[in-house]
Amino acid sequence: MKCMVTNVLRSLIENDKGELRKLEKMADKVFSYADEMEALTDEQLQAKTAEFKERYNNGESLDDLLYEAYAVVREGARRVLGLYPYKVQVMGGIVLHNGDVPEMRTGEGKTLTATMPVYLNALSGQGVHVVTVNEYLSTRDATEMGELYSWLGLSVGINLAAKSPLEKREAYNCDITYSTNSEIGFDYLRDNMVVRAEDMVQRPLNYALVDEVDSILIDEARTPLIVSGAQGSETNQLYFLADNLVKSLTTEDYIIDIPSKTIGLSDSGIDKAEKFFKLDNLYDIENVAITHFLDNALRANYIMTYDIDYLVNEDQEVMIIDPFTGRTMEGRRYSDGLHQAIEAKEGVPVQNESKTSASITYQNLFRMYKKLSGMTGTGKTEEEEFREIYNIRVVPIPTNRPIARVDHEDLLYPSLEYKFNAVIADVKRRYEKGQPVLVGTVAVETSDLISQKLVAAGVPHEVLNAKNHYREAQIIMNAGQRGAVTIATNMAGRGTDIKLGPGVRELGGLCVIGTERHESRRIDNQLRGRSGRQGDPGESQFYLSLEDDLMKRFGSERIKVFMERMNLTEEESVIKSKMLTRQVESAQKRVEGNNYDSRKQVLQYDDVMREQREIIYRQRQDVITADRDLAPEIKAMMKRTIERQVAGHFLGSKDEAIDGIIKFAHANLVEDDTLSKATFEAMNQKEIVEELYERALRVYDSQVKKLRDEERVREFQKVLILRVVDNKWTDHIDALDQLRNAVSLRGYAQNNPIVEYQSEAFTMFNDMIGAIEFEVTRLMMKAQIHDNIERERTSQEAHTTAVKNIMPNQSHAIQENVSFEGVDRNDPCPCQSGKKFKNCHGRK
């Protein structure tokens, strides 16, 4: 086994060496153009960009252009920035162009390294995104490096959260766009919620170069980006209003089909609804949100049964009953607003829920780019994850000068108190001799504690944490000055170099002190890497205690045994040993493994949504950008809806099937009383489908004629499809989230939660597609066509507008007609506010 591990390590090392030899040869070829480029005038050098673009358009690949293009950037950087990329920077630039990660130590000039692949890939005209962790770095790098790109004839944009859609679109249309990772993600999601192509801001995702790639693609991998809208009290009141109306209906006012669990309003029911909500036409396209509330109220009152489908517990919560076990299903809620409708029916508080309109994880966001690369000083420890998840290799790049930093062995103390006392003593000693010190902590609380102790010890210092991040760059820039003491959480200040002040080299350079080991070796290495940049002298020292989180979770028992063997029992004993360091790193590897497994599992779940999201977003794009009549698509939806409904009814007897089909058709396709049993008695299933489809087509044609011109027909079709798709997709996202929570418990029953999730999510997706087609069909058949068809910005806005239009009408009517006599204090208030009577009109 040991021999096998040794062989694997030797193989990896040899592969790295072979890769470096290849990169050196390529860098030498770039260097061979140096004299030629130096001889060019500014105008001739700048003209190279147009030449490269023409050659690319004529068939040369970016790989063919690499050597000359990199040489042009080197010479341009020398003239514009006064910087001339070293060979190791050129090597790193080649790795970046190949779609991999060069591991370059702190201070090796990653920002300058990036200019070469960014320039080269921008020549394609398809856009390059330089991704940073915060807007300060985006603005700084775009400003500094933008001088070079602009001089070479490329446009540079900065995408900031505060910018308008127009400004964002201009930024994304530039050759090179600087942005934070989160803003790219949110822009992508928002682009897939718009209803006009001209409202989109992004181009297709081409090439991303991610700075601090480990932070974004590893540490934040599990963080989902979510665009959501809260359901307010007005929305909740609409559930009660719809319930109030539905409870007043008679059996003639609705058409119910028990076998398929579908229900809809009859003509008399529609009349009552229009009168109740003061609407001209319930099935006007503008009122799609209202029909949603009514449909759910109908289902809640006439299909869902107390003690069979659900019950209300002592806390006044509606609990779903599992039809197979008869037990309540903890944490599960009906989707699509049905649960809230049942809450309104039962007179219990309607729970506010924020509706997720769109979401994506960074893992799936960045995997959509045609090419992805990134820079970090500490990526090798996560190489497996980069390779498995993103298909990216990590290539260690040699430093331009040998590393002179001294990394001391860890010091272990029996308690936190003794550890912190030792840290303060070390900091004070170094401060008194003038050596700058950077103290790294894992948490803000630790920063504050050490700050208090340093104040007590009379050591002036700066504290950098989440409370004062706006001064981050300034504090870090001064951290290398003589006598400077800086306390920072481990991740703070990344991307800003710490340069040594006058006389500091002679004092040993910057000393980095870690107050505990992080879960990840990579974070520890990042902290160490703040010292010893570009061959500068420096030191690093980690202080540990048996009471540290990492030690308590993984290492303390073994180390206690080790201490006992060495007879180290005194309270103030300290251990300094290579064996200790190995034990700590072993604990870190286990945590890293656990975290990787967790991120991998998140990806397995999210991959299911990714596939579904891509289908929905692609269909949305087709609708938004369509410059044609969408009648074939809508008619196909109508046909499939009819086929599904007829097939579902034919599961029973033909007599019952025909009754159900007539109810379905009257509620959703044609006028009431236009069909009878005699129409279908002599037909088989296929003939019934054809008959209904022919009748539906006649209704469709009559609806379209009302729109008069082709442009208005297309606009109406897009309004219809986008409204329905967005509403159903939003509900589906919530349903998937609930499913994920539910299947996670099934692992205890020896079932694979991932497999169960994939299977049920697939079924739910098909059900959603069926629901979309059903709703498009129903609205197409029943909508009142009028002259001012116009797409809303989002379906959420349409919903909000509908609610606001109705509420003023309703509140006045309710106050006029409501009686409060005989209402118990704990009963729901008759005003339909959703509150108990004692907290509303019964308040004394």
Swiss-Prot record:
It is found in: Cell membrane; Cytoplasm. One of its GO terms (molecular function) is ATP binding. ATP binds at residues 89, 107-111, 497. Its cofactor is Zn(2+). InterPro entries: Helicase_ATP-bd, Helicase_C-like, P-loop_NTPase, SEC_C_motif, SecA, SecA_CS, SecA_DEAD, SecA_motor_DEAD. May bind 1 zinc ion per subunit. Keywords: ATP-binding, Cell membrane, Cytoplasm, Membrane, Metal-binding, Nucleotide-binding, Protein transport, Translocase, Translocation, Transport, Zinc. SMART domains: SecA_DEAD (SM00957), SecA_PP_bind (SM00958). One of its GO terms (cellular component) is cell envelope Sec protein transport complex. Zn(2+) binds at residues 829, 831, 840-841. It comes from the Bacteria. It catalyses: ATP + H2O + cellular proteinSide 1 = ADP + phosphate + cellular proteinSide 2. The keyword Transmembrane does not apply. It is a peripheral membrane protein. Its EC number is 7.4.2.8. Its main location: membrane. GO terms for biological process: intracellular protein transmembrane transport; protein import; protein targeting; protein transport by the Sec complex. Belongs to the SecA family. Part of the Sec protein translocase complex. Interacts with the SecYEG preprotein conducting channel. Has a central role in coupling the hydrolysis of ATP to the transfer of proteins into and across the cell membrane, serving as an ATP-driven molecular motor driving the stepwise translocation of polypeptide chains across the membrane. Monomer and homodimer. Part of the essential Sec protein translocation apparatus which comprises SecA, SecYEG and auxiliary proteins SecDF. Other proteins may also be involved. This is Protein translocase subunit SecA. The lineage of its organism: Bacteria, Bacillati, Bacillota, Bacilli, Lactobacillales. The gene is secA.
